[in-house]
C-alpha cells in the first residue's frame, strides 16, 4: 500500500516536472532563441525599411540578414512571446540623407512602443501617418533636419510618455491635439523654430520635464500652470517671452529647476506665491529686463542651490535675503546696478562655492573680517566694480580659492605677498587696476596656476622666474606695465603655454639665443609688440611652433563673437563644456584679451583655441623675415610692422592658407610682392605701406578690395589703378621730372623721334626679306 502510494506520488511529480518544462521561459532568462521568433510580416517590413533607410551593415553589431531571426538584428527588440517588433533604435546609424514618407514600411510596425531615429540625417516633414504607431510610448526624432509643422496626428498617440524633437528645424505652433497626451512625462522641443501653442501644455498634468528652449516663443503660458503638479524641470531659455515672471510656476511644489534666461521678461519680480513645500534647487532668470530691488521674498526658496539673476536691471543695495538661502552653492548677480558694500555673507561660513558680483557698482569690500575655516568659496568674481584701496590681506584666508577676479576696479598698492603662498590658485585676474610694485614670486609652493592676467597696471621690475614652476600655465598677460626685462626664454619649456602677451612694456634685447631652445610647442598667441626687442631672426626661428601649424578640428568661427555654451552642473557649481576656448573652469570666467585685429582694437571676451596670432610690431627687429613663417599654416593674424626688416617678402607666406590679416608696413622691405599671396582666399586686411617695394601689385579679389593707404610709401609699386581709382605710371627719376605743361609740349616731339628711329631699320629689313623671297620663290613652287 505504502509502495503503491509512493509510485503514485512519483508519477504525479514527474507529470508536474514535464508540464513546467513545456512552459515558455520568461524573457528574464535571455538566451539566444533556438528557433525563429520574428514574425514574417515584421521581418519583411524591416527589410523593406532597410531599402528606404540606408543602414550600412558594417556599423551594425548584428547586421540585418534575411537568414537570421530579425529579433536578433541590431537595434531591433521583439516581444518575447508574440514575436512582434516593439522597439526600433537606429540612432546614429544612417549615413545618407533620407526622409520618412507616409507610405514608409516603418508604419507597418504597428506594435512599436519605442522608436528612436535620433541623429539619423532625416530630412523633410514628419508624416501624419505616424499615427499608425498607436502603441508608441517613446518617440525620439531628435538631432535631424526635419522641417515643417508637427502633424496634429501625433496627438492621437495617447500612450506617449516621451517625445524628443530637439535639434531640428520644426516650426509653427505646438498642435492643440497635444492636449490629449495626458500620459506625457517628457517633452523636449529644444532648438527648433516653434512660435506658439504652448498654452495647450497646461493640460499635460503628467509632465515632469518640459524643454522649450532655443525657439521663438513669445507669449508664456497665459493659463495657470499650477495644475502641472508633477512638473520637475522647465527650460524656456533663449526665446522671446515677454511680460511678467510667470508666478504660477512657484505654486508647483514638485518643481526642481526653472531656466528662463535670455528672454524679454520685464517688470519687478515677487516670490510671494512660492509654495511652502517648494523643492526648487535651481532658478535662472538671467539676461532679461527685470527691474527694482531683488525681492526679500526670495528667502522663501530655502532649497535653492543655484541662483542666477545676472544681466538684468536690479538696483539698490545688495540683497540680504540671499543670506537665508543656506543651501546656496552658486550665486550670480553680475551685470546689474547693485551698489554699496559687497554682501557680507559671502565672507562667512556657508555652502557657497562660486560667487559672481562683477559688473555692478559695489565700492566697498566691507570692514576687515576674519574669514573662518568653514568658508568653502572656490570662485570669486568682483571684476568691473568701483572697489578701491589696497587688496586686503585677509583675501588670502580663503584656503580653497581656485579662481579670483578683481579686474577693472580701482585697487592700489602692491599685490599681497600672501597670495604667493596660496597653493590652490588656478586663475588670478588683476587686470586694469592701479596696482604697482613688483610681481610676487608666484608658483613657489604650487604649480597649479593656469592663468595670470596683470595687464594695465603699473608693475615694475622683472618677470618673476618662479612662473617657470607653473606646469599648467596656459595664459600669461602682462600688457601695459613698466616691466623691464629680457625675453623670457625660460617660459619656452612650458608645454601648456598657449597665450603670451608682453605688449607695451620695457622688454629689451634679442628674442633669439643660439644656445637656448626656443620651445613654445603649444603657443597659439604671442604679442610682444611695442617693446624694445632687437636683432635678427634665423630662418628656422618659427620651426618649433607646431601648434600654429595644427588644425583645430572645428568649423571656422567668428572669434570675437560671444557664443553660448552648454553648462554642466557638478553639485552647486556649474562648469562650462567649452573646451574650444582658453580658460574653461567656471561659467563666470574665460580668459580674455584685447588685440589690434584687422586694424581695429578688438576685445576678445573669449579666446578660441584655434585662434593663432603673431604680433612682433613696434620693435627694432632687423634682417630678413624668416622663411619658416610659412610653416605656420594655421596662422590667422601676422603683424611685423614698425620694425627694420629688410630683403624680400618671403613667398612662403602663401602657404599660410587661413591668413586673414597681414601687416608688414613701416619696414625696409624691397623687391616685389609675391603674386602667390593673391591666392590667400581669407586674406581681408593687408598693409605693405612705407617700405621699398616695387613692381606690379598682384591682381586678385583680396588685393583689389584694399584701401589705397595699404600701399603708400612704396614709389616703385604700380598697377594700383583699380585700388586707388587713379592713374599710376612707371615712376621717372626726380631729375628728369618736369611740370605738367612741359610734358604735354614734349610728348608729340618724342613720338616723331621714335617714329624716325624705327623707320630706317624697317626699310632695310623690308629690302632684305624681299630679295630672299624673289630669289627662292621658284624652289618653293617646286616643293609644292
Curated annotation (Swiss-Prot):
Glycosylation, residue list: 132, 180, 193, 203, 273, 327, 421, 432, 513, 544, 562, 639, 655, 668, 679, 687, 707
Residues in compartment: Cytoplasmic: 774-784
Gene transcribed to yield this protein: RLP38
Bilayer topology annotation: Single-pass type I membrane protein
LRR repeats: 109-133, 134-157, 158-180, 182-204, 205-227, 228-251, 252-276, 278-301, 302-324, 326-349, 351-373, 374-400, 402-422, 423-446, 447-470, 472-496, 497-518, 520-544, 608-632, 633-656, 657-680, 682-705
One GO cellular component term: plasma membrane
Family affiliation: Belongs to the RLP family.
Keywords: Cell membrane, Glycoprotein, Leucine-rich repeat, Membrane, Receptor, Repeat, Signal, Transmembrane, Transmembrane helix
Pfam family, one: LRR_1
PROSITE patterns (UniProt xref): LRR
Organism in which the protein naturally occurs: Arabidopsis thaliana (Mouse-ear cress)
Main subcellular localisation: membrane
InterPro entries named among the record's database cross-references: Leu-rich_rpt (IPR001611), Leu-rich_rpt_typical-subtyp (IPR003591), LRR_dom_sf (IPR032675), LRR_N_plant-typ (IPR013210), LRR_R13L4/SHOC2-like (IPR055414)
SUPFAM superfamilies (UniProt xref): L domain-like
Signal peptide limits: 1-30
Extracellular topological intervals: 31-752
Compartments it resides in: Cell membrane
Protein name: Receptor-like protein 38
Claim: GTP-binding is one of the keywords in the record: no
Transmembrane feature ranges: 753-773
Amino acid at each position: 500500500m505504502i509502495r503503491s502510494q509512493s509510485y503514485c506520488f512519483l508519477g504525479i511529480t514527474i507529470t508536474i516536472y514535464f508540464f513546467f518544462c513545456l512552459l515558455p521561459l520568461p524573457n528574464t532568462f535571455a538566451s539566444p532563441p533556438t528557433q525563429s521568433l520574428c514574425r514574417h510580416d515584421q521581418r519583411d517590413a524591416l527589410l523593406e525599411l532597410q531599402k528606404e533607410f540606408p543602414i550600412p551593415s558594417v556599423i551594425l553589431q548584428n547586421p540585418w540578414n534575411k537568414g537570421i531571426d530579425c529579433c536578433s538584428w541590431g537595434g531591433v527588440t521583439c516581444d518575447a512571446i508574440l514575436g512582434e517588433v516593439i522597439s526600433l533604435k537606429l540612432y546614429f546609424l544612417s549615413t545618407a540623407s533620407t526622409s520618412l514618407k507616409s507610405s514608409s514600411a516603418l508604419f507597418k510596425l504597428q506594435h512599436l512602443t519605442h522608436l528612436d531615429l535620433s541623429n539619423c540625417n532625416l530630412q523633410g516633414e514628419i508624416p501624419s501617418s505616424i499615427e499608425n504607431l498607436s502603441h508608441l510610448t517613446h518617440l525620439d526624432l531628435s538631432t535631424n533636419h526635419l522641417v515643417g509643422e508637427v502633424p496634429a496626428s501625433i496627438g492621437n498617440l495617447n500612450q506617449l510618455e516621451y517625445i524628443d524633437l530637439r535639434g531640428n528645424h520644426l516650426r509653427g505652433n505646438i498642435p492643440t491635439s497635444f492636449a490629449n497626451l495626458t500620459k506625457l512625462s517628457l517633452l523636449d522641443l529644444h532648438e527648433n523654430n516653434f512660435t506658439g501653442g504652448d498654452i495647450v501644455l497646461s493640460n499635460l498634468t503628467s509632465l515632469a520635464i518640459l524643454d522649450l528652449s532655443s525657439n521663438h516663443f513669445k507669449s508664456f503660458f497665459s493659463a495657470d500652470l499650477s495644475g502641472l503638479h508633477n512638473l520637475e524641470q522647465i527650460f524656456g531659455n533663449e526665446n522671446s517671452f515677454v511680460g511678467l515672471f510667470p508666478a504660477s510656476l512657484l505654486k508647483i511644489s514638485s518643481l526642481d529647476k526653472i531656466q528662463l534666461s535670455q528672454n524679454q521678461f520685464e517688470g519687478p519680480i515677487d516670490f510671494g506665491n512660492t509654495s511652502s513645500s517648494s523643492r526648487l534647487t535651481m532658478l535662472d532668470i538671467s539676461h532679461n529686463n527685470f527691474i527694482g530691488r531683488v525681492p526679500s521674498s526670495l528667502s522663501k526658496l530655502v532649497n535653492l542651490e543655484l541662483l542666477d539673476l545676472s544681466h538684468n536691471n536690479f538696483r539698490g543695495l545688495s540683497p540680504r535675503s540671499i543670506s537665508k538661502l543656506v543651501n546656496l552653492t552658486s550665486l550670480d548677480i553680475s551685470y546689474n546696478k547693485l551698489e554699496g558694500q559687497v554682501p557680507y555673507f559671502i565672507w562667512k561660513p556657508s555652502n557657497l562655492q562660486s560667487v559672481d558680483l562683477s559688473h555692478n557698482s559695489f565700492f566697498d569690500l566691507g570692514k576687515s573680517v576674519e574669514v573662518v575655516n568653514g568658508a568653502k568659496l572656490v570662485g570669486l568674481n568682483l571684476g568691473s566694480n568701483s572697489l578701491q584701496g589696497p587688496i586686503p590681506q585677509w583675501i588670502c584666508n580663503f584656503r580653497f580659492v581656485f579662481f579670483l577676479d578683481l579686474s577693472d576696479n580701482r585697487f592700489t598698492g602692491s599685490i599681497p605677498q600672501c597670495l604667493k603662498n596660496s597653493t590652490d590658485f588656478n586663475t588670478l585676474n588683476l587686470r586694469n587696476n592701479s596696482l604697482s610694485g613688483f610681481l610676487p614670486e608666484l608658483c613657489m609652493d604650487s604649480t597649479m596656476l593656469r592663468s595670470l592676467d596683470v595687464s594695465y597696471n603699473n608693475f615694475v621690475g622683472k618677470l618673476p622666474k618662479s612662473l617657470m614652476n607653473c606646469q599648467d600655465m596656459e595664459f600669461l598677460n602682462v600688457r601695459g606695465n613698466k616691466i623691464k626685462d629680457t625675453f623670457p626664454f625660460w617660459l619656452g619649456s612650458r608645454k601648456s603655454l598657449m597665450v603670451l602677451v608682453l605688449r607695451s612694456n620695457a622688454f629689451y634685447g634679442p628674442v633669439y639665443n643660439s644656445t637656448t631652445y626656443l620651445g613654445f610647442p603649444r603657443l597659439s598667441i604671442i604679442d610682444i609688440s611695442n617693446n624694445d626687442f632687437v636683432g635678427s631672426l634665423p630662418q628656422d626661428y618659427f620651426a618649433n611652433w607646431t601648434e600654429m601649424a595644427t588644425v583645430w578640428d572645428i568649423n571656422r568661427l567668428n572669434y570675437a563673437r560671444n557664443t553660448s555654451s552648454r553648462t554642466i552642473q557638478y553639485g552647486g557649481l556649474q562648469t562650462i563644456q567649452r573646451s574650444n576656448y582658453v580658460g574653461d573652469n567656471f561659467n563666470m570666467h574665460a580668459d580674455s584679451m584685447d588685440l589690434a585685429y584687422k586694424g581695429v582694437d578688438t576685445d576678445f571676451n573669449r579666446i578660441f583655441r584655434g585662434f593663432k596670432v603673431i604680433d612682433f610690431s613696434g620693435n627694432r627687429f632687423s634682417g630678413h623675415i624668416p622663411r619658416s613663417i610659412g610653416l605656420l599654416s594655421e596662422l590667422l593674424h601676422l603683424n611685423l610692422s614698425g620694425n627694420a626688416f629688410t630683403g624680400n617678402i618671403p613667398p612662403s607666406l602663401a602657404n599660410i592658407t587661413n591668413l586673414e590679416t597681414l601687416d608688414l608696413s613701416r619696414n625696409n622691405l624691397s623687391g616685389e610682392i609675391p603674386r602667390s599671396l593673391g591666392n590667400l582666399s581669407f586674406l581681408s586686411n593687408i598693409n605693405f605701406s612705407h617700405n621699398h617695394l616695387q613692381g606690379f601689385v598682384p591682381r586678385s579679389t583680396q588685393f583689389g578690395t584694399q584701401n589705397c593707404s595699404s600701399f603708400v610709401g612704396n614709389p616703385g609699386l604700380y598697377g594700383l589703378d583699380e585700388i586707388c581709382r587713379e592713374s599710376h605710371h612707371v615712376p621717372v627719376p626726380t631729375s628728369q621730372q618736369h611740370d605738367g605743361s612741359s610734358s604735354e609740349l614734349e610728348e608729340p616731339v618724342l613720338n616723331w623721334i621714335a617714329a624716325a628711329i624705327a623707320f630706317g631699320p624697317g626699310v632695310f629689313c623690308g629690302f632684305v626679306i624681299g630679295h630672299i623671297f624673289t630669289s627662292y620663290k621658284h624652289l618653293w613652287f617646286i616643293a609644292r
